[in-house]
Amino acid sequence: MQCPSCQNTDSRVLESRAADGGRSVRRRRECLNCDFRFTTYERVETVPITVIKRDGCRELFNRTKVLHGLSRACDKTGLDAARLETVVENLELQLQQRTAKEVASSEIGELVLKELKQISEVAYIRFASVYRQFRGIDDFVSTLETMNTEQEHLAAVR
């Protein structure tokens, strides 16, 4: 590993531990040339996910875009950035576990909605209104009624 201070490639590992819930290894290193200490992270290389947009064009999955959409939907709901980061990490993990490395943007939207429904109804409605392109109040009412029916069903089952 190249030292960020002197660019020497000889270093020794002082400490290693799991990070990101076991998805990476954090290593504390010391340069053998200048004694500079630095941290590196080792992660499994993932296969890029290709997103098929509504218009048929393809682009690489961009976690920043998903996080931005979540942030807008969750603005002023009390959900912190760490929780949103966890939602995006869970989404990425689900996508990486699939055998197909192409996914429709609609599938990503539905996975995000599924996560949001569990953590914030307000964020769910806000995200759904953009993602599902609500045209008027009837779309909001319909979604709220569906959510209410689902909650009543869950309460009856318990």
Curated annotation (Swiss-Prot):
Protein's GO biological process: negative regulation of DNA-templated transcription
GO molecular function annotation: ATP binding; DNA binding; zinc ion binding
Comment on bound cofactor: Binds 1 zinc ion.
Zinc finger (unnamed): 3-34
PROSITE patterns cross-referenced by the UniProt entry: ATP_CONE (PS51161)
Annotated disulfide bonds: none
Residue ranges the record marks as coiled coil: none
Cofactors required: Zn(2+)
UniProt domain ATP-cone: residue ranges: 49-139
Keywords: ATP-binding, DNA-binding, Metal-binding, Nucleotide-binding, Repressor, Transcription, Transcription regulation, Zinc, Zinc-finger
Family of the protein in this entry: Belongs to the NrdR family.
Task performed by this protein: Negatively regulates transcription of bacterial ribonucleotide reductase nrd genes and operons by binding to NrdR-boxes.
Name of protein: Transcriptional repressor NrdR
Organism: Synechococcus sp. (strain CC9902)
